[in-house]
Amino acid sequence: MQLSVKLTANIDGLPLTAQKFEAAAPRKNITLFCLPGGGLSKDYFDLAPNFSFAARMSALGYDVITMDHPGVGENLLPADHPFYTPREAAGYLSQALTHWDMQGEIQTPIIGIGHSLGGMMIMLMQGLHAPFTRLGLFGSSAGGLDWGLSDEEKAYINKPHAFARELEAMSLAKFGRATIPAGKGPSGESITFGGQTPELTQRLRAAASEMNAAGAMMSMMRGSFRPEANAIAVPLFFAFGDHDIGIPPKDVPKDFPSAPSTKTVILGATGHNHFAFSSIEELCEAFDGWVGD
């Protein structure tokens, strides 16, 4: 049976929680801090038997922390909370990690793991606060999603400071609200967003969650967090499905000029939600090998 415990922190009056999956022996004394993609809860990292990143990595000796983004899932904010940006959310998350470290509740070093929009949040945390010694970015890059932008929005590509000034207005104009309600999840008609089987696609639907509009807007805008990407100076591990979204994987490392090394893995017969495919085994083995290099 998988052993897990709940972690709690109060950050500037905001209660935040996470789930910690305890490492099996022999322990590596390394923590993986994991953030899900937009529209998914932390349950994405514990999707189903044999399709659980948390279970696989804890069996390999890592402590694994999974956490919902501030404002969604178990970490909903008060209805009257002011509009907040992904950079502010990255600050909340980094403060929570510091709190748990000071309380002796987590092992260091910590490796940041992010899927899709969660990868952007991990990059913001590292670029602004540097809590991690390595980053694992799954289906995530700094290249944005140009196809998700209107012509008017595209005018802000590679203009991070101008975009930051307009982020609130653009997010509310595009999505109509600060928090996007949970959707129904993937239809299963496409490998890109579905799972390998109808059952795994259903598990993705069950893991659906709210999404922060500003986070969605920022993750789609190429160059929106270029200063943070430029500042990342730790080794990077990228994983993409061969039916993933975003810019070509070969172009992704170019946005991280300060990273001392990068490794890219392409998962065959895999969509954007990697853990819903049997290639999760290849992904976990490759990641573990990279950490041990």
What are the residue ranges of the model-derived segments?
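Conserved loop-alpha-helix segment in the C-terminal half of the alpha/beta-hydrolase fold
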Residues: 240-270
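Glycine-rich "HGGG/HGxG" loop immediately N-terminal to the catalytic nucleophile
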Residues: 68-84, 272-273
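Conserved alpha/beta-hydrolase
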Residues: 49-76
